[in-house]
Curated annotation (Swiss-Prot):
InterPro entries: Aldolase_TIM, Chorismate_II_sf, CM_dom_sf, CM_II_prokaryot, DHquinase_I, Type-I_3-dehydroquinase
Subunit note: Homodimer.
Pathway: Metabolic intermediate biosynthesis; chorismate biosynthesis; chorismate from D-erythrose 4-phosphate and phosphoenolpyruvate: step 3/7
High-level lineage: Archaea, Thermoproteota, Thermoprotei, Thermoproteales, Thermoproteaceae
HAMAP family the record matches: AroD
GO biological process terms held by the UniProt record: 3,4-dihydroxybenzoate biosynthetic process; amino acid biosynthetic process; aromatic amino acid family biosynthetic process; chorismate biosynthetic process
UniProt keywords, alphabetically: Amino-acid biosynthesis, Aromatic amino acid biosynthesis, Lyase, Schiff base
Protein name: 3-dehydroquinate dehydratase
Active-site residues, as the UniProt record annotates them: H119, K145
Catalytic activity, EC: 4.2.1.10
Role noted for this protein: Involved in the third step of the chorismate pathway, which leads to the biosynthesis of aromatic amino acids. Catalyzes the cis-dehydration of 3-dehydroquinate (DHQ) and introduces the first double bond of the aromatic ring to yield 3-dehydroshikimate.
Domain Chorismate mutase residues, every copy: 222-301
Chain residue ranges for the region called 3-dehydroquinate dehydratase: 1-221
Species assigned in the record: Pyrobaculum aerophilum (strain ATCC 51768 / DSM 7523 / JCM 9630 / CIP 104966 / NBRC 100827 / IM2)
Residues annotated for 3-dehydroquinate binding in this entry: E32, L33, R34, R63, R183, T202, Q206
Length: 301
């Protein structure tokens, strides 16, 4: 198994206090709390933000609309919000590299690591443009984040080439169906942080945490480190990946049941399920339960 130090970060659009409470129940070690979505007063969510910082690695982000965010105020108001958020001592803050406030935020960030980001939700520019973006972000940020939209798989390769190309740790991947593979490849190439959905996707092609864990495990990638913390995280990955695959199997069983029913064919396939049980080996009891669940799903399809 290959160990990588990638930080799996659940992205949370924070509108109300309950959004933070729910996120803290998720099996992820990092939370990006998107406060550009905030509908409540900051004072109302502040205690929960402090609690989140104490329990998880936390990124505070107030994304402007030009780069896919929901912030409706001016830059002066956004800078003021970042100042208040920095009082909570987050591990990271994310500010767009092209934002006029990034220089001031960099001066007051304290111990927080500044992620200087750049997003293009429409296309993937040529490599020379991407390289310029990365260099400019590296000049002000502790980490670089470059995310574009892939219209074809080759677009994703250009973005991935930024990882390791500048002197700062670089997060780089592509959005959209054609770029979905880059979200997994980036982890293998050394991206320090990767982002997953905890229910509500905030970007095209964003994978759920469970789907992402399944993909990493399929490639033999496991959490880095040793001792109980690493083992607990590894177990979260396995549990999440297993739940994702079981849900997918039930969905396929349901679709098969409907098609067979419409065609007048026997709904339940004993031969196929017997093959599954033979392959299950030591996990036969678990898969017997899965088989029975699939049988029930097909019968009611």
């Amino acid at each position: 198994m290959l160990q990588y130090g990638v930080l799996i970060c659940g992205v949370v659009p924070v509108r109300k206090p309950r959004d933070i409470e729910k996120a803290l129940e998720a099996p992820v070690t990092c939370l990006e709390l998107r406060l550009d979505y905030l509908e409540a007063d900051l004072a109302e969510v502040r205690p929960l933000l402090e609690h989140a910082v104490a329990r998880r690695v936390v990124i505070f982000t107030v994304r402007r609309r030009e780069e896919g965010g929901q912030w409706r105020g001016d830059e002066e108001g956004r800078e003021a919000l970042y100042r208040k958020l920095l009082e909570l001592n987050p591990h990271y803050i994310d500010v767009e590299a092209e934002s006029p406030i990034i220089g001031e935020v960099a001066k007051i960030k304290g111990k927080a690591q500044l992620i200087a980001s750049r997003h293009d939700f429409e296309k993937t520019p040529p490599l020379d443009v991407l390289s310029q973006w990365a260099k400019k972000a590296a000049a002000v940020g502790d980490l670089v984040k470059i995310v574009t939209y892939a219209k074809e798989p080759g677009d994703g390769l250009r973005v991935l080439s930024l990882i390791g190309a500048v002197e700062k740790p670089t997060v780089a991947f592509a959005m959209g169906p054609a770029g979905a593979y880059t979200r997994v490849a980036a982890a293998a190439l050394g991206s320090p942080i990767m982002y997953v959905s905890l229910g509500e996707a905030t970007a095209p092609g964003q994978l759920t945490a469970d789907a992402y864990y399944a993909a990493l495990l399929a490639l033999g990638i496991t959490p880095s480190g040793g001792g109980l913390p690493a083992l607990r995280e590894a177990l979260d990955w396995v549990d999440g990946g297993l739940m994702y695959l079981l849900k997918k199997r039930l969905e396929v069983c349901r679709d098969m049941g409907r098609l067979k029913k419409d065609a007048g064919l026997p709904i339940y396939d004993d031969v196929r399920e017997a093959q599954v049980l033979r392959r299950a080996g030591d996990f036969k009891q678990i898969f017997e339960l899965v088989v029975q669940m699939c049988k029930a799903v097909q019968l009611v399809a």
